[in-house]
Amino acid sequence: NNLISFTMKRIVLFLILLTKAASANLISFTFKRFNETNLILQRDATVSSGKLRITKAAENGVPTAGSLGRAFYSTPIQIWDNTTGTVAAWATSFTFNLQAPNAASPADGLAFALVPVGSQPKDKGGFLGLFDSKNYASSNQTVAVEFDTFYNGGWDPTERHIGIDVNSIKSIKTTSWDFANGENAEVLITYDSSTNLLVASLVHPSQKTSFIVSERVDLTSVLPEWVSVGFSATTGLSKGYVETNEVLSWSFASKISINKEDEENKLLISNLEGKAINNLA
């Protein structure tokens, strides 16, 4: 499978990036298991048994309707530098698991997001805690990759999907996603600052299925210089449309280029992603 091979190569590049953590212009962190240290937990988000549980469930494990939770790394991340004009290349890898009591009606989904420092939860349900029904403007200053399990007719494609969101819950680019209820999903998201290309790939190892979506996003025109990175998730507003939203592990690395070697590394990532996208077209 071309996409799985491509994803593995991107994971290797991501790990190479992480090994350069001694570099002064690189920030990286890894949660193999979660505790509350270094996390900002909002609303219903909790840590339990090493898992980051974004939305609420009852003691018997049944998800709660109308739940909203968010969790962000506690240290702000510099995405671009207004003085020099440089933009960070970054990558994140995480494993999540969504499980609905009724596999035919999960809701609403989970998203990885970059938000302004100090951002507070927004609307429940289909807005995934990141946006609200009254504001589709640039003032949101939010970029997200959503893993959307429920069709909201006002803005969603008809199928479950992975979408890239820029200041709005209406994705600028989507790809259909065969949601695997209760099965782990492994995600890798990369941003190449030399091309502005944001690429998100998801693999369900148990199903041997994989999905990819990409789009060019100029982060300097969307985000503030410093952001918080993390997750937001919601359940449906009625008990027949709910799911658990758990993140099992998470790594992140970002680096603002300051030398030729960094530029060569970015070019390598850019060429690899471009070839893979062409092969899958």
Swiss-Prot record:
A GO BP entry: defense response to bacterium
Maturation and modification: Glycosylated. The beta chain is produced by partial proteolytic processing of the alpha chain.
Site (Cleavage): 263-264
Glycosylation sites: 35, 82, 140
Temperature-related behavior of activity: Activity stable between 4 and 40 degrees Celsius, declines at higher temperatures and is lost at 90 degrees Celsius.
Disulfide bridges in this chain: none
Presence of the UniProt keyword Aminoacyl-tRNA synthetase in the record: no
InterPro entries: ConA-like_dom_sf, L-lectin, Lectin_LegA_CS, Lectin_legB_Mn/Ca_BS, Legume_lectin_dom, Leguminous_Lectin
A Pfam family per the record: Lectin_legB
Presence of the UniProt keyword Phosphoprotein in the record: no
pH dependence of activity: Optimum pH is 7.4. No activity between pH 4.0 and pH 6.0, 80% activity at pH 8.0 and 20% activity at pH 9.0.
Protein family membership: Belongs to the leguminous lectin family.
Role according to the record: D-galactose-binding lectin.
PANTHER family to which the protein is assigned, alphabetical: CONCANAVALIN A-LIKE LECTIN FAMILY PROTEIN (PTHR32401), LECTIN (PTHR32401:SF45)
Subunit structure: Tetramer of 2 alpha and 2 beta chains.
Name of the protein in its database record: Lectin alpha chain
Organism from which the protein derives: Lablab purpureus (Hyacinth bean)
